[in-house]
Design a protein with these regions (language model features):
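Non-catalytic alpha-helical scaffolds and adjoining flexible linkers that form interface surfaces
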Residues: 101-124
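Conserved short S/T/G-enriched processing/targeting/catalytic segments and their helical context
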Residues: 1-102, 106
Length: 124
């Protein structure tokens, strides 16, 4: 089970998550479930993840790739936190759809993401 918590205070945000991942019996390891994106001076965004590790790693890598390749939609070009959540949700949804087609394989690509942060001028 993964724990990700976000609390909004008058002074800002408090974010915390566990770092244990379980790939089966006796296959427990640690992996950060919190990724910080400070790629532009006017924003600080944090993505916390739970669920299938391959799915969540893909989403984080795709976000980084879109920034590196200066895609039209990336974390630096979106003006609102809600637009950023939609963008990340689209990446996640497309990945889940791609691997959910063959349910007989037993692979469960599900993941849950929690986005927190602030874009200058907007609320946290």
């Amino acid at each position: 089970m993964t724990y990700c918590v976000a609390i909004t205070l008058d002074a800002g945000l408090v974010l915390t998550s566990d770092s244990r991942t379980n790939a089966g019996v006796d296959q427990v390891s640690t992996y950060s479930k919190m990724t910080r994106f400070e790629t532009h001076a006017d924003r600080c965004l944090v993505l916390m993840s739970a669920g299938n590790l391959a799915t969540t790693q893909f989403v984080v890598e795709q976000i980084h790739r879109d920034i590196r390749e200066s895609q039209a939609r990336n974390l630096n070009t979106l003006s609102y936190l809600s637009d950023t959540a939609d963008y990340i949700g689209e990446i996640l949804s497309s990945r889940i759809r791609r691997y959910s087609e063959n349910e007989a394989s037993g692979f469960a690509p599900e993941a849950t993401l929690l986005l927190a942060g602030q874009i200058q001028g907007g609320p946290p």
